[in-house]
A protein has these predicted regions:
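SH3-family beta-barrel domains
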Residues: 1-21, 32-35, 43-45
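Short alpha-helix capping/helix-loop boundary micro-motifs
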Residues: 23-28
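SH3/SH3-like beta-barrel superfamily modules
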Residues: 30-68
Length: 68
């Protein structure tokens, strides 16, 4: 995992999208967010040839969502 870019913003999903605890194609899916859901992210990461945004969940766990 690269160190990521400390960048923040909000992103609205255009399709049902997996949420993972690590930014990896092979990481298990923790749950799904639906099209139209908005993510307030605080980090961007490039891993496995993909771009991921990341946020800290209400439970304190860092989550990753692939955005490309």
């Amino acid at each position: 995992i690269d160190g990521g870019i400390a960048e923040s913003g909000s992103y609205t999903l255009t399709k049902r999208t997996a949420v993972k605890n690590t930014p990896s194609d092979t990481a298990p899916v923790e749950f799904y967010l639906e099209a139209g859901d908005k993510i307030n992210f605080d980090l961007k990461v490039t891993q496995d040839g993909h771009s991921w945004i990341s946020y800290i969940s209400y439970s304190g766990v860092r989550r990753y969502v692939q955005v490309d």
